């Protein structure tokens, strides 16, 4: 009897643990982190982006809507027409964990805000789901985004990253080129540029410190007038050749000018 009671309690505890584990697993959030050096500086500003989440309409439909007031050639995801209210303006907030609001240089600040913007509003660029918050771990110098663990916030049928990555569409009637996904190459170039720049200026490596010392701004030097030097050399060479060719002792009939030519011009 005691053995059966112990077995019953064992299975009951196991079942309860399984339910708790399943609940935690379903509610657990994943974290995507990038190492980003948090160098301190004296420059900070905010980034405001005016954007529209729209796909390009078909050429014939865009031609019909081109002259209509308040319309353009971009359709919202899942719609076949693009209205003026589809536009929105975002004001980026600074992620928590970075209180002094300073980074080293303009490009670093733009890359920092670009990651925060992309992770919050376009997480499908990183292949993650709904992002709950973006934070900074100053101890490990990480910038992280917590998400729900799913692959994408946009359905597969309208996934811009999967369908239109690095693809250009030409509107025949307008004659303009529209980049269907501008955020991925823009953010990637900023991120690579800033990480390489911070790695080069990292105080950990003596080689990078030496490069930074070499690249420090120096006092400008006076420009050298190469034309002036060339004219002097040519004048000297010409005068020497004239002296060799026409010596004054052997040519008594040479008339010398009474007034020297003016060189002011």
UniProtKB/Swiss-Prot annotation:
The chain crosses the membrane at residues 8-25. Glycans are attached at residues 27, 42, 50, 130, 151, 159, 194. Keywords: Glycoprotein, Host endoplasmic reticulum, Host Golgi apparatus, Host membrane, Membrane, Secreted, Transmembrane, Transmembrane helix, Viral envelope protein, Virion. It comes from the Viruses. Residues 239-265 are annotated as: Disordered. GO terms for cellular component: extracellular region; host cell endoplasmic reticulum membrane; host cell Golgi membrane; membrane; viral envelope; virion membrane. It is found in: Virion membrane; Host endoplasmic reticulum membrane; Host Golgi apparatus membrane; Secreted. It is a single-pass type I membrane protein. The keyword Endoplasmic reticulum does not apply. Pfam families: Arteri_env. Minor envelope protein. Belongs to the arteriviridae GP3 protein family. Heterotrimer of GP2a, GP3, and GP4. The GP2a-GP3-GP4 complex associates with the E protein. This is Glycoprotein 3. It comes from Porcine reproductive and respiratory syndrome virus (strain Lelystad) (PRRSV).
